[in-house]
Regions:
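The feature marks the mature, well-folded catalytic cores of soluble enzymes
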Residues: 1-240
Length: 240
């Protein structure tokens, strides 16, 4: 079993499918101090790697949902409440928006939530992009898709297989466009997208890249373009 962290809207979509029955879907509440246009974005309030690290303003409700599925001792050993509460303006909204890959932790380190760094047991890489997780979609352990060319170049130098796609073509209400990494997430052998890739000009390249890495593409809606939902995050219960 694992834990899937999603916005309330996306959690409802996922719960209606029979594809995630082996996992517990957690509907993460909005961040009260964030811009209402992206207050529901999960990756601004939750970080998953060796530990689940939660912003203080959503921790109580998220832990309550986790508690219904697993032991108290497990929660005490795996769940950490962060020091920072995300708030406006930037960069105060992104301390949890950290990209965790198999071998590296990547973020604008001067603004990273201290508990993330404290519990990190892998090399940390400093980049200029504060919205790091929003900008990158992990596809397995050694591959990523990004619409940020600079981040893509950095990840290539670190040995990752990187697909760089065009910016835009991801909806985010109130903004010209959202970020591709924020429109989905990896759950086991599945890459889950909040919307349909057919509306994206790089759809075929993205699909082939996902297939190349032996993942199954799941689209939560076949009638609308991708929507930046602040990522879909996954924590495998078996992670030590």
């Amino acid at each position: 079993m694992g834990f899937i962290f999603a916005s309330k809207t996306v959690a409802t979509k996922m719960a209606s499918l029979n594809l995630f029955s082996g996992h517990k879907i957690i509907a993460v509440p909005d961040g009260p101090l964030l811009d209402e246009r992206f207050a529901d974005h999960v990756d601004l309030k939750v970080f998953c790697d060796d530990k689940i690290i939660l912003s203080p303003d959503v921790a109580e409700e998220v832990i309550h949902q986790i508690r219904g599925a697993i032991s108290e001792s497990w929660i005490q050993s795996r769940v950490v409440i962060g020091d920072k509460t995300p708030r406006m303006p930037y960069p105060n909204d992104v301390p949890y928006n950290v990209l965790a890959l198999k071998q590296h932790l990547i973020h604008k380190l001067e603004i990273t939530e201290p508990q993330i760094l404290k519990h990190c047991h892998k090399p940390v890489i400093n980049v200029r992009q504060g919205y790091t997780r929003c900008s990158v979609l992990p596809v397995g352990e050694q591959a990523v898709i990004t619409d940020d060319a600079s981040l893509g170049d950095t990840l290539r130098t670190l040995g990752y297989d990187v697909l760089i796609i065009c910016k835009g073509h991801v909806q985010l209400a109130g903004f010209p466009y959202g970020l591709f990494g924020g429109s989905g997430g990896s759950i086991g052998n599945k890459v889950v997208m909040n919307g349909c890739l057919k509306f994206h000009p790089d759809a075929e390249r993205i699909k082939q890249f996902i297939l190349k890495h032996h993942k199954v593409l799941i689209e939560l809606d076949d009638q609308q373009p991708l929507i930046d939902c602040g990522s879909i995050l996954f924590y495998d219960e078996g992670v030590s």
